[in-house]
């Protein structure tokens, strides 16, 4: 049965707990109102994370564009763009250059553009509703799917955190010329994270400026490597704008798939939808909402353009200097330059395989110690900035899905402990190759979690009761559905290839069992999404006891007043 706006619901329904029902909730009359219901600032005062300070937007006469307003909206997009520059992305970039040369730059460009479109949806959800993605999921999905979804997103955040720990530990090891062991670098990342998290006590704009400083460090360090190596500009442009991959075989194809998985991060959708709430926007005023959407999109374009250029620096450096190189050639150069790392590479004619650690070493062998240390500084900046945004993502997700407020200190202790323990064990009992090899597994993990961000964001931004006049149009719904399907398919291929290479029967059995459960849940989310996109014939109504209405625009959002959100 579908409840009308006039019907009252139980306390459990208001809190978002629908028991074991498989369906989403019913419509919230606040969202069905064509005028956006929430006034600026209401129902948001209980948020403690990141929102202790609101940035006001300057009042100006109506104009098509204002630099003052763009500056006021600048911040969330650059914090979001950090996920496009984390150590996992940097490793994917350098491997892409070493394995395929410049041939996959167009894949990087395409993945970044797709990421921009998805970030646009995330930002619009936060601006229009005043709720971030985790909060909307908490209010709309039944209890069991909601908990599973939360666990999947938490897994993605922890996996990302492990990549950041690995990157920072390797950077510290390189900067100390090996004096600080990898396990020591892992421990150092615990302390520095807490130090950086206290920066937001000094004001939101100062925190955003610090992130801008870290992005600048990455641009300068990786830009230095680009200028030093002097890659062919014609090859860079050809690789970027000519979509071809002549001579590409399985390693190059797998690397292309890996680029997509590394660039589009699941937790980033949750992060961006929350960060945009830090600006004062009167959601009763459609013009202000439309203006906020416009400036946030412009800022996201600028931020992702910067991140794309930095990624191009890394790909181009390794494409120019190390594409087609063999281990024997590298050993010879490292020996001639008296590098202490010459023994890191086998003396054979196999193609050079690089990672974050070996990448710094070969740069030092070919272009001098300065190139190695500057590379390490860039990796350290990538690891530290990603650590901080990952912590915010975890806090938003936990508060939104569980309706539970934790202090940042407690949140960091929990997440970082889970990420540190396996990383520390590998750092202590194995070598750097095993530590950097964890990145491959973690990239697979991130790929597996993508549907749990992409499907919900497309579902909710396509529903008029949620987004009012700002819901996705038919073109966006079709394009979004196709993009989500393609991205999920690409990443599933990446996972299948990884599992195939494991080569152990027991692991195949485990993978098969997990895959059945995984695909079943993805099917459930996809089914709900298709109904939201307008395919009401998929709603089997009362015959399946799912409680969905045949009218897709009326089946979402619980009957509760938007101003009476659950206190945390």
UniProtKB/Swiss-Prot annotation:
Assembly and interaction partners: Forms a complex with NDFIP1 and NEDD4L, in cortical neurons, in response to iron and cobalt exposure; this interaction leads to SLC11A2 ubiquitination by NEDD4L and proteasome-dependent degradation. Interacts with NDFIP1, NDFIP2 and WWP2; this interaction leads to SLC11A2 ubiquitination by WWP2 and subsequent proteasome-dependent degradation. Interacts with COX2 and TOM6 at the outer mitochondrion membrane. Interacts with ARRDC1; this interaction regulates the incorporation of SLC11A2 into extracellular vesicles through an ubiquitination-dependent mechanism.
The protein's name: Natural resistance-associated macrophage protein 2
Protein's organism: Homo sapiens (Human)
Major subcellular site: mitochondrion
NCBIfam families tied to this protein: nramp (TIGR01197), Nramp_1 (NF037982)
Transmembrane regions listed in the UniProt entry: 70-90, 97-117, 155-175, 180-200, 209-229, 256-276, 302-322, 361-381, 409-429, 441-461, 483-503, 507-527
Family affiliation: Belongs to the NRAMP family.
Record topology, Extracellular segments: 91-96, 176-179, 230-255, 323-360, 430-440, 504-506
Anything else known: NRAMP2-mediated iron uptake is markedly stimulated by nifedipine in a concentration-dependent manner.
GO biological process entries: cadmium ion transmembrane transport; cellular response to oxidative stress; cobalt ion transport; copper ion transport; dendrite morphogenesis; detection of oxygen; erythrocyte development; heme biosynthetic process
Biased composition regions of type Polar residues, renumbered to the chain: 23-40
UniProt membrane topology term: Multi-pass membrane protein
Cytoplasmic-side positions: 1-69, 118-154, 201-208, 277-301, 382-408, 462-482, 528-568
Pathological condition linked to this protein in its record: Anemia, hypochromic microcytic, with iron overload 1: A hematologic disease characterized by abnormal hemoglobin content in the erythrocytes which are reduced in size. The disorder is due to an error of iron metabolism that results in high serum iron, massive hepatic iron deposition, and absence of sideroblasts and stainable bone marrow iron store. Despite adequate transferrin-iron complex, delivery of iron to the erythroid bone marrow is apparently insufficient for the demands of hemoglobin synthesis.
Record function comment: Proton-coupled metal ion symporter operating with a proton to metal ion stoichiometry of 1:1. Selectively transports various divalent metal cations, in decreasing affinity: Cd(2+) > Fe(2+) > Co(2+), Mn(2+) >> Zn(2+), Ni(2+), VO(2+). Essential for maintenance of iron homeostasis by modulating intestinal absorption of dietary Fe(2+) and TF-associated endosomal Fe(2+) transport in erythroid precursors and other cells. Enables Fe(2+) and Mn(2+) ion entry into mitochondria, and is thus expected to promote mitochondrial heme synthesis, iron-sulfur cluster biogenesis and antioxidant defense.
Result, substituting residue 48 to T: In a colorectal cancer sample; somatic mutation
Subcellular location: Mitochondrion outer membrane; Golgi apparatus, trans-Golgi network membrane; Recycling endosome membrane
HAMAP family: NRAMP
Tissue note: Ubiquitously expressed. Expressed in erythroid progenitors.
Residue ranges of the region described as Required for early endosome targeting: 555-559
Keywords: Cell membrane, Disease variant, Endosome, Glycoprotein, Golgi apparatus, Ion transport, Iron, Iron transport, Lysosome, Membrane, Mitochondrion, Mitochondrion outer membrane, Phosphoprotein, Symport, Transmembrane, Transmembrane helix, Transport, Ubl conjugation
Record's compositionally biased regions (Basic and acidic residues): 8-20
GO annotation, cellular component aspect: apical part of cell; apical plasma membrane; basal part of cell; brush border membrane; cell surface; cytoplasm; cytoplasmic vesicle; early endosome
